Amino acid sequence: GLGDVYKRQVYVDGKEIGAKEHLSVPNRFLLSKQMTPGMHILTICVDNRLKYPMDQWNHGTTEYTQTNWNGIVGKIELTAYEKTNIHALKAYPDIETRTVTLDITVNNTTGQPTNGLLQLVINEKGGKTVSEQSFPITLKEGSNQLIKEISMGKNIKLWNEFTPYLYEVKAMLTADNKQDSKNITFGMREVTQGKHHIQINGRNVHLRGALDCCVFP
């Protein structure tokens, strides 16, 4: 993931693969076709010139506060995945029905449809198993979205700032005699809008924080 101020481009062996302008989220580039076995030169070009009018954001471009970062913020990673892999795993809890809906994106880059087995295990963080299920799946070539609703049982533990109970879900994919997995943590909570406050699980939340300029990155 890359994070500088304006634009970054990625090249493999001198050929541009793509360009992105995101800052608040990781910038990911898919290099599967270019990274064949052997030696390659990977180049990242960071362009911090002012690309857009920034008059209203001058605190982010002058030497008095944030100034020019002149580089890359965050981790730089090159990661290898199986041809059939879990690209994304998201959890959407529902405290009223005591369930969590899992949104799973599976990539199949084998060039043809394939069958597999998806296993989902939910544990209390550092504790007992809440749910364990497996499903046979058929994957078309490319991106596949799988939606699964899982019961969390009768005695769910709710998350809030004072009792931040967490659960961990692990998704395991077996396809073409290869395995891939992804883990995330989540809390059982409901965020709603009250009359004058944001509410978590029906209770008002009093937000507090600090603004520290000129200390990032």
Question: What is the predicted role of each segment?
Answer:
Residues 1-217:
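Secreted/periplasmic carbohydrate-active enzymes, especially glycoside hydrolases
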